[in-house]
């Protein structure tokens, strides 16, 4: 009698031969691990006198947990689920960002700003569904036109929110019938964003804002970036700004900045450290960012100090910076006054002040900290831990780091001698770029030849390298003159190469791919990952959930390029079909077991 076991086996034989063989092999290994786990655990228990036993047991338990996750995923594939596409999510998830449930956080007892933080631990059971775009969504305009004009239906903002916005970065923009237009001169303080940037340059001692790089300023952390006007100007100066702002259900600064093709991500530091290592940025900028700097034992300002490089600058602009009263001895209660009092305790110096803008410079001499009074803020005992949303600390970080190098003294171009530079650099980029064409999705796909036209240099703008290593894909894009920027993501359990990426002047962040990425849906044009799937095989992650997350952050008609071992790529192709991507596996023809999976997300309209 043919029971459920026979049907399961029959469904496996219905899959493609390569997937079928792979599934049998992996399921067999998982079953063997599950059967032998108790025996192995007992053998370790019998030698409990060894100090290694707790670590061995903990690591083995982690393997068993991962085996269970893999088994469930493989079982669903073996039962024919690979032929079943994920359902579409409801309308309420069109702008859904996981891990930011303010209502749920309040119910959990979080308050004083912590309810606005990222809390993946409170996520309910995941609903496996594909997030659809809004009914009036349109493909963004190509860069640079898309920097100044975006479709209003692509962002979640009401007309009243737009018109009532009072931040210094949101003036003189036009909300037309279905477009939002950003002027190059959009009223950012005084006579415009260019004048504002020039003023900051003069406060540093430069002739103009075109000389920022000469002063060592290449990377800028922009806190509360409004609609991205300041960041857009810095991009035009070939600098790398990264906008961070708290999660907003509507009228999001981060969503608007990314829609304009500007680097941004959801982030705040009310109670947790930012996912960047110490000494990451050359400048931190806050223009009416709404931060109260002197609360929580000044830990918010200490977090700015942690990510600021030696010799770097902190720019604070706010109308409340003006002193109250006209007499010299009038007691000042402005934000800048309170920050200045704290700055003396952390070896910052007030370099300049003009109107509502104040500029502090962090010391480049680490001996300054030992010469302070005993009442000053203590130094942290810096370790090797990765700063991935750790609690804020009431101490000064990075003073003993080998990367303590003044931004004015470092080499003009930081790089790496990695052997992977050539493998994952220009040659790989040319290979990938030639594949971004509808030719591979024809009935007879082929590798484009020299006679085939390449995609335009500006067909994509927002790129995410999900396993960035040293940022070599980013470097290759720049060398080839592509009009794209890259969010270089370093997995938390991989080698921490983010300091190298940031020292090269690129954007980057630490992230755990077992969790959703802190961004809004449809914010990236291309996702790239080299051997990420193999790396995640040792983590407690579900590849199904990873592909759903990739689909969430990828815009319609966006691209995915995955490079990995042939077995993993075959499994990835099955998952790509479940999220409705058009996919092709490309043999690199180099004698290795590496394959490319090139996918394009279709634009499925309602």
Curated annotation (Swiss-Prot):
Looking up InterPro entries in the UniProt record yields:
Put_SAM_MeTrfase, SAM-dependent_MTases_sf
- Highest taxon of the source? Eukaryota
Q: Which Gene3D superfamilies match?
A: Vaccinia Virus protein VP39
Q: What does the record give under GO molecular function?
A: methyltransferase activity
> Is Endoplasmic reticulum among the key words of this record?
yes
One record GO biological process: methylation
Keyword Transferase listed: yes
Chief localisation class: endoplasmic reticulum
EC category name: transferase
Sugar attachment sites are 101, 409
Compartment list? Endoplasmic reticulum membrane
Cytoplasmic side of the membrane: what ranges?
A: 1-20
Q: How does it sit in the membrane?
A: Single-pass type II membrane protein
Q: Give the UniProt keywords, A-Z.
A: Endoplasmic reticulum, Glycoprotein, Membrane, Methyltransferase, Signal-anchor, Transferase, Transmembrane, Transmembrane helix
Name listed for the protein in its UniProt record: Probable methyltransferase PMT5
């Amino acid at each position: 009698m043919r029971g459920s076991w026979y049907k399961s086996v029959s469904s496996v034989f219905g899959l493609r031969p390569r997937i079928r063989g792979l599934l049998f092999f992996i399921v067999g290994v998982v079953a063997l691990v599950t059967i032998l786990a108790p025996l192995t655990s007992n053998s370790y228990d019998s030698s409990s006198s060894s100090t290694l036993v707790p670590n061995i047991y903990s690591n083995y338990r982690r393997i068993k947990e991962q085996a269970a996750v893999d088994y469930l995923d493989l079982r669903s594939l073996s039962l024919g689920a690979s032929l079943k596409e994920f359902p579409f999510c409801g309308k309420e998830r069109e702008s859904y960002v996981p891990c930011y449930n303010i209502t749920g956080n309040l119910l959990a007892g979080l308050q004083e700003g912590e309810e606005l933080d990222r809390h993946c631990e409170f996520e309910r059971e995941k609903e496996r569904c594909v997030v659809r775009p809004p009914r009036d969504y349109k493909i963004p305009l190509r860069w640079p036109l898309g920097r100044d004009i975006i479709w209003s239906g692509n962002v979640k903002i009401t007309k009243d929110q737009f018109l009532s916005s009072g931040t210094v970065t949101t003036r003189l923009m036009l909300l037309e019938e279905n477009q939002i237009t950003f002027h190059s001169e959009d009223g950012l303080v005084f006579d415009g964003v260019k004048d504002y940037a020039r003023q900051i340059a003069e406060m540093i001692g430069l002739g103009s804002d075109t000389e920022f790089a000469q002063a060592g300023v290449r990377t800028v952390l922009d806190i509360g970036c409004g609609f991205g006007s300041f960041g857009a100007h810095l991009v035009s100066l070939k600098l790398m700004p990264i906008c961070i702002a708290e999660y907003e259900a509507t009228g999001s600064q981060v969503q608007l900045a990314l829609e304009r093709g500007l680097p941004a991500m959801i982030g705040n530091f009310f109670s947790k450290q930012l996912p960047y290592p110490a000494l990451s940025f050359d400048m931190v900028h806050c223009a009416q960012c709404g931060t109260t700097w002197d609360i929580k034992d000044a830990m918010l300002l200490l977090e700015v100090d942690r990510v600021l490089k030696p010799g770097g600058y902190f720019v604070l602009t706010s109308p409340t910076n003006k002193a109250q009263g006209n007499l010299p001895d009038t007691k000042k209660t402005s934000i800048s006054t309170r920050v200045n009092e704290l700055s003396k305790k952390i070896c910052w110096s007030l370099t300049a002040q003009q109107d509502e803008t104040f500029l502090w410079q962090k010391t480049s001499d680490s001996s300054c900290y030992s010469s302070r009074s005993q009442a000053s803020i203590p130094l942290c005992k810096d370790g090797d831990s990765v700063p991935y949303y750790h609690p804020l600390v009431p101490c000064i970080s990075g003073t003993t780091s080998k990367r303590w190098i003044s931004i004015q003294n470092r080499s003009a171009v930081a790089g790496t001698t990695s052997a992977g530079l050539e493998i994952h650099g220009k040659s790989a980029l040319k290979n990938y770029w030639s594949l971004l064409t509808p030719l591979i999705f024809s009935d007879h796909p082929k590798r484009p030849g020299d006679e085939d036209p390449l995609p335009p240099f500006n067909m994509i703008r927002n790129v995410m390298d999900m396993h960035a290593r040293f940022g070599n894909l980013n470097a290759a894009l720049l060398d080839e003159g592509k009009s794209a920027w890259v969010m270089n993501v370093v997995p938390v359990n991989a080698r921490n190469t983010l300091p190298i990426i940031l020292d090269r002047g690129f954007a980057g962040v630490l992230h755990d791919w077992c969790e959703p990425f802190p961004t809004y849906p449809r914010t990236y044009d291309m996702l790239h990952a080299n051997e990420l799937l193999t790396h995640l095989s040792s983590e407690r992650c579900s590849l199904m959930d990873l592909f759903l997350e990739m689909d969430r952050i990828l815009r319609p008609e966006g691209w995915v390029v995955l490079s990995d071992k042939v077995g993993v790529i075959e499994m990835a192709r099955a998952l790509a079909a479940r999220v409705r991507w058009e996919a092709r596996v490309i043999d690199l023809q180099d004698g290795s077991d590496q394959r490319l999976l090139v996918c394009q997300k279709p634009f499925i309209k309602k």
